[in-house]
Regions:
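Bacterial signal peptide processing site
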Residues: 13-16
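Short, structured motif recognition centered on aromatic/hydrophobic residues
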Residues: 30, 44, 101-112, 120, ...
Length: 275
């Protein structure tokens, strides 16, 4: 999942740098939610480094193979169904990371104190207030502008500069596929409630046997997998938007997309080999 975010948000030049910094970035992100104490910090830092080492050795080749398949199809017409097929192929890679991380995280999360759970509640409340202000309570025209801006930024990271005509086509697709912010909000609250329920249920448990550790990890994996599920309607809309844009791609944009994907593959191969 973290690698997917890297690919979406970064250019090739920054991918290797952030990937190798993921344990540090993840630690401080988690500290912002749980106020990690001195007893928990060493195990968490070591666990995050171990997850990254496992991902480099075991997951990067599969991710790179998928990127290679995508690159080879770029010069051909692509349907929304094909786009969704690539996303579906990536899901096992996301789940593998979630599952591996849960095995490590469960051992630390059970040590959270009551004060840390209250800290978590405050952090969630703050983030939810910001999310509501940006998305749920915003004017429709502002929502469309924000959605369009994000879509164009993500497309330009792969394809390079986008023309006014292409921007209007993306805007038309976004207008046709209305995003259900209320449903997204309810999903957000449900996932947060499920995770908080796990934290409360397992806080203070002694995981001193392989069976106890496995049960805690599997329970956490189920919570995280449910939270990571992508609603089918949103997935299909995103896939169709990408397919529509692909049909408008210029030769220069095609060349840039190929260059971008080849850069990703080169960086991931280097990371896999220890870079």
């Amino acid at each position: 999942m973290t690698l997917c975010l890297c690919l979406t948000l970064l250019g090739c030049s920054a991918l290797k740098l952030l990937y190798n910094q993921l344990p540090t970035v993840s630690y401080w992100w988690l500290d912002g939610y749980f106020d990690i104490n001195d007893q928990q910090a060493p195990d968490l830092k070591l666990g995050l480094r171990d997850v990254l080492a496992w991902h480099k050795a075991n997951e990067l080749p599969a991710v790179n193979a998928l990127l290679s398949d995508v690159e080879q199809q770029l010069e051909k017409p692509i349907t929304g169904a094909q786009m969704c097929g690539w996303f579906t192929r990536f899901e096992p890679r996301v789940n593998a990371v979630l599952d591996r991380t849960a095995v490590m995280a469960a051992l630390i999360l059970v040590t959270l104190t009551a004060d840390q759970l209250r800290y978590f509640d405050k952090a969630i409340a703050k983030n939810n207030a910001e999310w509501r202000e940006e998305w749920l309570d915003a004017r429709p025209e502002d929502l469309m502008e924000s959605r369009l801006e994000r879509a164009i930024e993500n497309l330009e990271r792969v394809y390079g500069p986008i023309s006014r005509q292409q921007t209007e086509a993306v805007k038309a697709r976004l207008a046709k596929d209305a995003y259900d912010f209320e449903q997204n909000w309810q999903n957000r609250l449900r996932n947060q409630t499920a995770f908080k329920g796990w934290l409360v249920a397992y806080r203070g448990r002694v995981l001193d046997t392989p069976e106890a550790k496995q049960a805690a990890a599997q329970s956490l994996q189920a919570v995280w997998r449910a939270a990571a599920e992508w609603r089918m309607t949103e997935r299909q809309q995103t896939c169709q938007l990408l397919a529509d844009f692909h049909s408008l791609m210029t030769p220069a944009q095609w060349a840039q997309a190929v260059k971008t994907y080849q850069g990703y593959q080169k960086d991931l191969q280097s990371l896999h080999l220890g870079g």
